[in-house]
Design a protein with these regions (language model features):
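Conserved catalytic core of nucleotide-sugar-dependent glycosyltransferases
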Residues: 1-69
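C-terminal catalytic/acceptor-binding lobe
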Residues: 42, 47-48, 57-58, 62, ...
Length: 147
């Protein structure tokens, strides 16, 4: 039984503002999205694990919850999945259907403002991914004391 589930087939399809408006005006949003999927821009061209996940709250908090060493948008999604795996909690993936990303205005935290912040986030991902279960357990325990 998975402690975390990515509820889509790891494909993310981005809709433009016009496509989003048309979808939201349709009688059946899901049918509209599925009918027009081929016209939506595929994100990254590789499997994604971000944007949406379901998790056992108790297990997730035991695993540290959100890693606040990340700023902005980016590798925190992959870190979250890898951390769960290192700590021995299975992550499931639904293999039926993409994630549809509706257009929306972007806020300040939706991008990196400088290379140093982007680099710091990538280094945090690498740091976590290189840990074994004991190192990661100790590291997560230290997060509770950092405030």
């Amino acid at each position: 039984k998975a402690a975390m589930v990515i509820p889509y087939d790891q494909t993310v399809l981005f809709l433009s503002e016009e496509q989003t408006v048309a979808s939201l005006r349709a009688d059946s949003i899901l049918e509209h999205l599925q009918l027009h999927s081929a016209s939506y821009r595929r994100w990254l061209g590789r499997p994604s694990c971000g944007g949406l996940f379901f998790v056992n709250r108790e297990v997730y908090l035991k695993c540290g919850g959100e890693n606040e060493h990340f700023y902005g948008w980016g590798p925190e999604d992959a870190e979250r999945v890898r951390r769960m795996e290192i700590l021995g909690y299975p992550v499931g993936v639904n293999t039926e259907g993409p994630l549809y990303h509706l257009w929306h205005p972007r806020g300040d935290n939706s991008r990196f403002f400088n290379r140093q912040l982007a680099s710091n986030s990538r280094l945090e991902l690498i740091r976590i991914c290189n840990m074994d279960i004991k190192e990661l357990t100790d590291d997560v325990a230290s997060w509770r004391n950092r405030k």
